[in-house]
Amino acid sequence: MMVTVIGAGSFGTAIAQVLSWNAEMVRLMARRSEVVENINRTRENSAYHPGVKLRDNIEATLMDGSVLEESEYVFMAVPSGNLRSIVRSMNSSLEDKKIVSCIKGIEHPGLKTMSSVIREETGSRTVFSISGPNFADELIRGMTSGITVGASTRYAREIAGLLKSPRIILDHSENVEGVEFCGILKNVYAVAMGILDGQITGENHRHSLLTLCFREMNLILNEMGYGELHDRFCGFGDFLLTSTTDKSRNRTLGLMLGKKMRLSEDSTITIESLRSIRAIRELTEGLELPVLEMVYQTMQEPENVNLYIREFQERISRPEF
C-alpha cells in the first residue's frame, strides 16, 4: 500500500518513518522545493531531525494533489491554522481518500476540530484521527510510544496495520472528535502547569496541581460527551507527558509566561495556544473552571500573571464541600 503524509515538519516526518515499516511507499509532502530536494538527497530532514536517516521507501515531494492518486491513506500533519487552505488547494484529490488527522488544534472562530474541517472541505466520509503522548524526536527513533486511533473498528484495524510495531502500543476509540479534543485540552493544561511551575513548593504541591488540572480536563470531557477517553493514551497519557516534561512546547510557553518573559506574538505555538484557549473557553461557558480562567487571563494580560496566580490560589484553597 502507498501512503502519503502531508506536512514534512517534525511530526509529519516522524509518522512517515513509522509508516514506512508497513507501507510499500510513503510520500512525504513539503511546501518548499529545497526541503524536498534536501530530504531526497541526504535521506534526512535536517531542519527537524538532524542525524536521523529516513528509510529508503520514503520519498519527499511537493504538495500536489496529483501525487495522491495512488495513495489509499493520507495522514495530515500540518499546522492547524494552515489546514483549511491546504486541504482546499487539493480537495478534489482527497474526497475519495481515507484521511487521518495527526493535528492537535481547533479552528477559531468556528470551533471546529481538524477532522470537521477536513470533512467540510473534502466531503470525505472516511476521516479519522490519531493522538497520544508522542514527542516526534522519540517516535522517529523507534522509542516505545502509545497512540490512540480514533476510527470505527473496521478502519481502526487498517490504521493499526499501518502503525504496528513492537514499539508502538495502540488503543482505540470510535469517537474521532473526542480523540482530537483530548489533544486540544491537554495543550491548555500544559500551559497551566508551566505558568504555575514557579510557585510550586515541592512534589506534594506539584501533583496536587496536576490532579486539579486533570480533574478540570475530565470535567470538560464529560460535559462534551467524551468522558470515556480520559484513560486512553490521547487522554491521561498525553496530558501527563505534555504537562510535566520540559520538551513540551506548551509547558515551555507556560514557563515563559510565569517568568514574565517576552513572547513572540506571531510564533506558531503562541497563536495556536491562544486559539485553543479561547475556543475551549467559549465551548465551556457556564462551567466553573478556575485553571482555564487563570490561563486565559494570563495569555490576555501576561504582565499581570502574579495577580492571576494569586487569585487562582485563593480560589483553590477554599474547600469544595
From Swiss-Prot:
Signal peptide location: none
Gene Ontology CC, one term: cytosol
GO BP term, example: glycerophospholipid metabolic process
Pfam families, alphabetized: NAD_Gly3P_dh_C, NAD_Gly3P_dh_N
EC supergroup of this enzyme: oxidoreductase
PROSITE patterns registered for this protein in UniProt: NAD_G3PDH
EC number: 1.1.1.94
Active site positions, chain numbering: 186 (proton acceptor)
GO molecular-function term, one example from the UniProt record: NAD binding
Superkingdom: Archaea
Catalyzed reaction equations: sn-glycerol 3-phosphate + NAD(+) = dihydroxyacetone phosphate + NADH + H(+); sn-glycerol 3-phosphate + NADP(+) = dihydroxyacetone phosphate + NADPH + H(+)
Residues the record lists as binding sn-glycerol 3-phosphate: 104, 132, 186, 238, 248-250
Cell compartments where the protein resides: Cytoplasm
Predominant place of localization: cytoplasm
Keywords: Cytoplasm, NAD, NADP, Nucleotide-binding, Oxidoreductase
Binding annotation for NADPH: 10-11, 31-32, 104, 136, 249, 272
Function: Catalyzes the reduction of the glycolytic intermediate dihydroxyacetone phosphate (DHAP) to sn-glycerol 3-phosphate (G3P).
Further remark: Glycerol-3-phosphate dehydrogenase (G3PDH) is generally absent in archaea, because archaea, unlike eukaryotes and eubacteria, utilize glycerol-1-phosphate instead of glycerol-3-phosphate for the biosynthesis of membrane lipids. Surprisingly, the genome of the thermophilic archaeon M.thermautotrophicus comprises a G3PDH ortholog, most likely due to horizontal gene transfer from a eubacterial organism.
Family note: Belongs to the NAD-dependent glycerol-3-phosphate dehydrogenase family.
The name this protein goes by in its record: Glycerol-3-phosphate dehydrogenase [NAD(P)+]
Origin species: Methanothermobacter thermautotrophicus (strain ATCC 29096 / DSM 1053 / JCM 10044 / NBRC 100330 / Delta H) (Methanobacterium thermoautotrophicum)
Gene expressing this chain: gpsA
